[in-house]
Design a protein with these regions (language model features):
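Hydrophobic ligand-binding cavity/cleft-lining segments
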Residues: 1-43, 143, 153, 158-164
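Hydrophobic/aromatic beta-strand elements that line small-molecule binding cavities or substrate pockets
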Residues: 5-7, 36, 61-66, 86-93, ...
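Beta-strand elements of well-folded, non-transmembrane domains
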Residues: 9-13, 52-56, 67-69, 81-83, ...
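A short, structured loop/turn motif at beta-sheet edges
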Residues: 13, 40-44, 66-70, 90-100
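Hydrophobic pocket/interface hotspot
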Residues: 16-20, 26, 48, 101-103, ...
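Glycine-rich portal/gate segments that line the openings of hydrophobic small-molecule binding cavities
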Residues: 37-79, 132, 136, 162
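Beta-strand/loop substructures that line and gate deep hydrophobic ligand-binding cavities in soluble
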Residues: 76-128, 164
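A conserved amphipathic terminal alpha-helix motif
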Residues: 109-164
Length: 164
């Protein structure tokens, strides 16, 4: 499965990057996230474990994510029920208080049974993830360095929900 989503957001790239990197906060605004913990974090990498629970399906995913704040974070699977799982977040500053977010993910479950059980659930999660961060940005505190100008966020058309 290939997923590509993008959105224009009335927040700085730094602010959006910080929301994306803060996996420990995901349970507060992602209804499918039953738990999350940061395993390690430094200037170049963040590693996290996320428990996904949605419509009776529950599994854990551990990723190690190389990053370049505020414009890029890779998503690299360390552990989880996937044969393939790789993705990225790209953030492009458009103005001091606006940016473009791009999310891409390619994944394939490691077993046909898991694909049937969790595939549609995970499809829904990945296809609504960018929108969830846009909503979160509208309710989160703007960092002191960023202007407090509010602009409505706009989701742009998704370019993919292609099955491989």
């Amino acid at each position: 499965m290939n997923v590509r989503k993008s959105a224009l957001v009335g927040r700085s790239a730094e602010h959006m990057f910080d929301l994306i990197e803060a996996a420990e906060d995901y349970p507060a605004f992602l209804p499918w996230c039953a738990g999350a913990s940061i395993l390690s974090r430094d200037e170049n990498t963040v590693a996290a474990e996320i428990t996904i629970e949605f419509h009776g399906v529950r599994f854990q995913v551990t990723t190690r994510n190389p990053k370049r704040r505020p414009e890029y974070m890779a998503i690299v699977l360390e552990r989880g029920p996937f044969r393939r799982f790789e993705g990225e977040w790209r953030l492009t500053p458009l103005a001091p208080d606006a940016c473009k977010i791009e999310f891409g993910l390619q994944y394939e479950f490691d077993s046909p049974l898991m694909g049937r059980l969790a595939g549609s659930v995970f499809d829904r999660i990945t296809n609504t993830l960018v929108d969830a961060f846009v909503v979160r940005a509208g309710t989160s505190t703007v960092p002191a360095a960023a202007p407090a100008t509010e602009q409505p966020s706009q989701s742009t058309g998704a370019t993919g929900n292609e099955h491989n």
